Amino acid sequence: DRIAGEGEVASDGWSIAFPESGTSNTINWDNLNVLNAAAQSDIQNGLVDPRIEHLLAILTQKYTLDISSLRSDHSMMTASGNVSNHYYGRAMDIAVVNGVSCTDMSSTSPCSEVGRLLTLLPDGVKPTELIYGYDLDGSGPAFALADHRNHIHAGFGPA
């Protein structure tokens, strides 16, 4: 049986434009704080995957971010024994959004907003690894790990 009812359809315009892919010049550096020199060097020396740079360019249009880990400042192996995508420059960890630590996992926190936004990006732009302290999208690519309650991990597999 079908259910009938009255209602209004609401739409929300996309408030973020997609910059051109491939160069760190599209990153709004005023909105990006890379927490250590090794990670800063990774970006400046082209050691970060262009897909990560593209995510940074998208996110720094609207949000201020503190990045706690990129490539050179992360271990080769994950806690589960796999080679980390950080090792190849294909992942980043976001520790703070708009001045609020990602330890705030409330549904209205800036980190939760960024995490949900990442799940809504189109294929090819959306991270294939998205880890936080809770599952951001149900059946999508995101999942929760207890050791990610203080940052959002966004990463990609091989191109």
Task: Show the residue positions of the predicted features.
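Catalytic cores and adjacent binding grooves of peptidoglycan-active enzymes
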Residues: R2-T26, D42-N45, D66, V83, ...
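Helical scaffold of the NTase/Pol beta-like nucleotidyltransferase catalytic core
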Residues: W29-L65
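Residue-level detector of functional hotspots within protein domains
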Residues: R51-E53, T78-S80, G138-G140
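Active-site-adjacent substructure of cysteine-protease-like catalytic cores
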Residues: I58-R90
